[in-house]
Amino acid sequence: MAEYWQQLTNGAGEAGPGNESSAMADCNGGHESAAVGGSCNRHSNNNYVNFNQFIMQHNLGGGAPSNATSTMQHPVGSSYTNFSLGGGGGAFGLNPPVASASTSHFANVSHQSPNFYSQAMIPTYQNGDGIARVTVTSSYGSVNPSNSNFSSFYTPFGNNPFDFSASKLQASAPEFVPNFAKLSLEETPAAATTNGNSTASLETAINETRPRTLRAQEPAERGANNQCSNHNYERERERERDRDRDRERDRDRDRDRDRDRDRDRDRDSRPGNTRQQRRSDYRDDREDRYERSDRRRPQKQQRYDNHRSNKRRDDWNRNRDRINGFPRAVDDLDTSNESAHPSPEKQSQLQQISPRRGPPLPPADNEKLSQREKLVRDIEQRRLECLVCVEAIKSHQPTWSCRNCYHMLHLKCTITWASSSKSEVGWRCPACQNVLQDLPRDYLCFCGKLKNPPVSRTELAHSCGEVCCRIEGCSHACTLLCHPGPCPPCQANVVRSCGCGRSTKTMQCAMKEEVLCGEICDKLLNCGEHRCQAECHSGKCAACSEQVVQQCHCGKQERKVPCTRESQDKRTYSCKDSCGQPLPCGHHKCKDSCHAGSCRPCKLSPEQITSCPCGKMPVPAGQRSSCLDPIPTCEGICSRTLRCGKPAHPHQCGSKCHLGQCPPCPKQTGVKCRCGHMDQMIKCRQLCNRADDARCKRRCTKKRSCGKHKCNVECCIDIDHDCPLPCNRTLSCGKHKCDQPCHRGNCPPCYRSSFEELYCECGAEVIYPPVPCGTKKPICKLPCSRIHPCDHPPQHNCHSGPTCPPCMIFTTKLCHGNHELRKTIPCSQPNFSCGMACGKPLPCGGHKCIKPCHEGPCQSAGEICRQSCTKPRPTCGHKCAAACHEGACPETPCKELVEVQCECGNRKQNRSCQELAREHSRIATIQLASSMAEMSRGNYMELSEILAPAKKSNKTLDCNDECRLLERNRRLAAALSSGNSDTKQKCLTKYSEFVRGFAKKNPALTKSVYETLTDLVKLAKESKQRSRSHSFPTMNREKRQLVHELCEVFGIESVSYDKEPNRNVVATAHKDRCWFPATSIMEVLARESGQRRVPVPSNNAWGLKK
């Protein structure tokens, strides 16, 4: 194929002007792009060119007359040189391209040029139905008179166009073979119409696609020609981008180096930072950076794989459309030489990542990994976390691994955890709660052979790198390298026999399969006589099921027992009843329990009794001939040992020789109780036990082990005093009682469990059995489903409480007394109090309720009105002020305070109305007396003035020196015609009763405030600013009131800020609104206390003292 294409290229190059066909051949897919309306991209990354480029470059043709011609319109914006192909009769042809000034369509060009075989041909390019057809007609009839086609010279397939085995064409994938059901070189027009490949159908598809293709190519019309024809420009751009990336990478590397240098310099400058600490910190930082890089690498690899997969699928679809002859839009063409997601290798080169490859991607199904594989993966990817400190486990940090659950922890954390355990039997693993006895001290590898394993880049962290050799569950050692987690199942081959031992089988050691032969077991059973009749089985045979009959020794009973080795040898047993066999004497029967062998001789026989009961006198021979004869006694003392007396010297019977038991001892025995409290002599007949086992009646008063009850046992000798009483306290479940003996501390949790499902209130959540007693209902996150008193949706979740929380949605409600309508009252609150006075009329009819807004009646039963009467007095007009009453007001002196003043109004004082009435009465009496005196002298007096009621006036005080001083100042100011607006304020300086009273109690503070305000006014008058301020320190209410009232005297504004107890006053003096008072508060106090200030002598105009 390559040789043939080279021949075609060379032939066309020799014939055409400018050797333009060679340039066409250099562009991959050039003819193909022209055929489908695409663009030629020299640098397109197309992996599917082996078959498609060859087929499309030669434009399959056939099935149409050789003289049929049509015009192929080139898409708008394409600047490729128009070309035409030569061929005929379904053959392949190539003709050099002919330059044309038109860039929008292909024109029919008739060009005579010698071909590869030095034949002048007139090629015609036609594409009326979407499939390129070429007809080549010879221009010299003498050379080719029959107008034959040149298929034998132009087709690469030889005589058979579809014989792929005979051609040199090689397809790189099965999907590259064209769909011949859609495309055929020898297809007739009728067959093409049937298969959907007719000219009309394909031309319709092209016409529908062409407008969209033209619209897509219009924005790229400018410069498309330059991009395809001048690939040197693209190469230069690529080099420029590479240089920019290199410069950016160098800048990033320099910036990272500077940052690392600064960080190292700061770390080295810290106090107490040793070289070992810096090395450890550097190792931690390096591992952290590598972990972050490892976490990002799988994501980049996954994105790159997805991109490659999508690109491969798009390229396959495009090549399939090319083979089937369907047009392709420009948007589907991939003209980019670079991938949107570069490969991880390329990113690693650009970013200068460490050449060390990261761990592989984790498997999609994590459950398929064993615990050992998961631990290895987590160690390699540095994902392990300590369960105690919840920190990452580094490769250089000492670790400890549990031999039960194989969890890895920091060795330091494990030692701290084990040392803090308060259990007496050991300590528990934080992961599996397995009880361990020994405390971890050493840092060992996973297999335990190497102490303090070194950190190696080539071996797994925390391992020794040697063979594990651990033995778990069998006699074979693990053959893997030192690894975390449990060892894998043993793979050693072993020979196992069946249960009966007749057959054997070779299998892996880890296999738990039982070897059974299926025959009868036939092993001896436990009885040693019968054999097992069951099928071959593993383990011991069952006990023998046969029954053995046994008979008692006396012959009265018999029984059946299982057949065992003991029952086989023993055919008799003892029934424990009285034997009842007649004795040899013939008079008595055997009273022993059922026994084997012969019965013992009679105890009363002459052969058995040879002496008297005390044993001192032998029985004469011939005195007793049978067991029925009486036993003779002697006259001696019995002297048999009794139970009384001290253990070392017991008492003896003092009666004469006798038959039967000895009578009670008449002596006394010294008895000491076992607790040591009692030591006395008691009669032997009163002893119920031995002398050394006597007990007193003293009760023990010590506390028992529970610490709650007393021992209260008589003659107690216990040391621990365990409490035998039941605890009987209610357990944490609230339903059951503690059934353990009374103990100290809390009772254990209730051990009972319920085997019924435990549902929440609404039934959405459930806890399946077994449910421990006392377990609370499951937490449900659904809204509460109970019936609520209001219509609002519930704002709380499902709960198990007896009552629902109150509804807190704001509603609009009136207060108790209908004074105020508020919109922020919770729905669950039925009403509220606004805090205002109730104002409802009381039963007395003259007053209203003054209580804060409340619910219910204003007065309780039996309560009377306590308010003062508000009716006016007929004399003075003030209120009655007596307790609420019915009828006329009582005549009582009026105690209402009335303000009185002097004639000039400077002095003011509060007096009771009663005193003022007496003063008025005295003045009226004096006036009447003077009028009568004038009339007695014969002067004329107006009778109406005498009989008229006396006018009451509040100016009853006398003016003092201060009043006269103010009057003098006022007249002086009026005489001088002073226009000062502050004259009135300065001349009439008045201090309130509060200021004067406070100044008497605390003159130091009053003087300090007065001087501060004086300095503030002086500063404001002299300042260029409009006002000056001063902030007083934190004060209580009385001190702040003093400052406020003194500020009024100076004409200064005062404002209080902050909240109690940090409230203070800020005084602001305005330049044009403040003044100095005429008299200071100290002078007023001195004048009121009787201390007159003597004026200091001053020089007159002549320089002499007055």
UniProtKB/Swiss-Prot annotation:
Residue stretches making up the R3H domain: 1006-1071
Record's compositionally biased regions (Low complexity): 189-201
Top-level division of the source organism's lineage: Eukaryota
Zinc finger annotations (NF-X1-type) as residue ranges: 474-492, 527-546, 585-604, 644-667, 706-725, 733-752, 844-867, 876-896
Keyword DNA-binding found: yes
UniProt GO cellular component terms: nucleus
Phosphoserine: residues carrying this PTM: S336, S339, S343, S354
A single MF term (Gene Ontology): zinc ion binding
Major localization class: nucleus
Annotated GO biological process: negative regulation of transcription by RNA polymerase II; protein autoubiquitination
Keyword line: DNA-binding, Metal-binding, Nucleus, Phosphoprotein, Repeat, RNA-binding, Transcription, Transcription regulation, Zinc, Zinc-finger
Ranges of Basic and acidic residues composition bias in the record: 232-270, 278-323
Subcellular location: Nucleus
Expression across tissues: Ovaries and embryonic central nervous system.
PANTHER family: NUCLEAR TRANSCRIPTION FACTOR, X-BOX BINDING 1 NFX1, TRANSCRIPTIONAL REPRESSOR NF-X1
Family indicated by similarity: Belongs to the NFX1 family.
Protein's job: Plays an essential role during the late stages of embryonic neurogenesis. May either fine-tune the guidance or the spatial maintenance of the migrating SNB and in nerve roots, which are composed of axons originating from distinct groups of motor neurons and may be required to either guide or maintain the position of these nerves along a direct and straight path to their ultimate targets in particular muscle fields. May play a role in egg chamber development and/or may confer essential maternal contributions to the early embryo.
Protein name per Swiss-Prot or TrEMBL: Protein shuttle craft
Natural source organism: Drosophila melanogaster
